[in-house]
């Protein structure tokens, strides 16, 4: 009985150590990404990229990392027009931002799901990341994009307070806009707006 107990305790210590190591790695990667997103556009490699392809990659990464998460991607028919989903940007940074938004949707929703929709309006491409989760408390909204700020929902899920600050910096680096609408116990919607590339 003692040996079984000792084995269980040892296993728990190892699991906790691995969990701590993963959290430290995630924090370290987040800090490096935050620093990179603070560069100006001349310091970042930019090229023409399709947002729908980056979204597909991001959703696949999230579902591979979290088997219980579900991502529902919804594209308008006009997505077949390459120009309308193409912007000048950095593939890695945008994918990082999209992964953060999708994971946020999933981890704060009881059904662990995120709905991502691409739409278009007057040379703009809009991407909405929505969930039906617990929502963001009103008093936390003004601090949402502050680095290391963790709001009243911090006990609901683990995090380091870097994700939303990183997302905002990446979107601004791409000359985009980000807004958020949230309703208690009904969900949250993050909306990104970018200018798409137009032919000369």
Locations of regions flagged by a protein language model:
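A conserved beta-strand-to-alpha-helix junction within the catalytic ATP-binding
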Residues: 45-63
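Acidic ATP/Mg2+-coordinating residue in the GHKL
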Residues: 131
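Conserved micro-motifs of the catalytic ATP-binding
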Residues: 39-44, 82-89
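Conserved glycine-rich
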Residues: 176-177
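Short helix-loop "hinge" at the ATP-lid/N-box region of the Bergerat-fold HATPase_c
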Residues: 105-106
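Short conserved segment of the HATPase_c
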Residues: 136-148
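Short alpha-helical segment of the dimerization/phosphotransfer core of two-component systems
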Residues: 19-24
């Amino acid at each position: 009985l003692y040996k079984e107990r000792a084995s269980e305790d040892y296993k728990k210590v190892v699991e906790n150590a691995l969990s701590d190591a993963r959290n430290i790695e995630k924090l370290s990667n987040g800090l490096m990404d935050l620093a990179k997103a603070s560069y100006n556009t001349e310091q970042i490699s930019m090229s023409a990229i399709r947002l729908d392809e980056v979204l597909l990659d991001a959703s696949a990464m999230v579902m591979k990392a979290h088997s219980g998460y579900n991502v529902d991607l919804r594209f308008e028919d006009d997505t077949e027009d390459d120009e309308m989903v193409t912007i000048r940007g950095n593939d890695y940074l945008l994918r990082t931002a999209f992964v953060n938004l999708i994971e946020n949707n999933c981890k704060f929703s009881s059904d662990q799901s995120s709905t991502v929709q691409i739409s278009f309006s007057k040379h703009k491409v809009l991407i909405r990341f929505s969930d039906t989760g617990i929502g963001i408390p009103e008093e936390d909204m003004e601090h949402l994009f502050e680095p290391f700020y963790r709001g009243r929902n911090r006990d609901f899920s683990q995090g380091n307070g870097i994700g939303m600050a990183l997302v905002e910096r990446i979107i601004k680096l791409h000359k985009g806009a980000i807004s958020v609408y949230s309703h208690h116990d009904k969900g949250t919607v993050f909306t990104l707006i970018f200018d798409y590339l137009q032919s000369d």
